[in-house]
From Swiss-Prot:
Lineage: Bacteria, Pseudomonadati, Pseudomonadota, Gammaproteobacteria, Alteromonadales
Family indicated by similarity: Belongs to the GroES chaperonin family.
Quaternary structure annotation from Swiss-Prot or TrEMBL: Heptamer of 7 subunits arranged in a ring. Interacts with the chaperonin GroEL.
UniProt cross-references to CDD domains, sorted A to Z: cpn10 (cd00320)
Entry protein name: Co-chaperonin GroES
Family annotation (SMART domains): Cpn10 (SM00883)
Gene3D superfamilies, per the entry: GroES chaperonin (2.30.33.40)
């Protein structure tokens, strides 16, 4: 897949959601929630500040992240794979 996001945008691939409940029951279809964990597959050059400088992003390709699904998150299919395009500010944490 060859795609390059602009500015402070990040492209992530969602991790599969857990398909079992806490009690061990296998969940089917719409009973499983979409995961808010993802792997970063591409990052932009950085955020352009008011003074014209570019602040590099804190995330890098390969990082495992937790993100907020909100208004600015865009779902796209690229090369047959579903990816999410979001701003770095939509990322809540990097899983270490």
């Amino acid at each position: 897949m060859s795609i390059r996001p602009l500015h402070d945008r990040v492209i992530v691939k969602r991790k599969d959601a857990e398909s079992k409940s806490e009690g061990g029951i296998v969940l089917m279809g719409s009973a499983t929630e979409k995961s808010t964990r993802a792997e970063v597959i591409a990052v932009g050059n950085g955020r352009i500040l008011e003074n014209g400088e570019v602040r590099p992003l804190d995330v890098k390709v390969g990082d495992q992240v937790i993100f907020s699904e909100g208004y600015g998150v865009k779902t796209e299919k690229i090369d047959g794979e579903e990816v999410l395009i979001l701003s770095e500010s939509d990322i809540l944490a990097i899983v270490e």
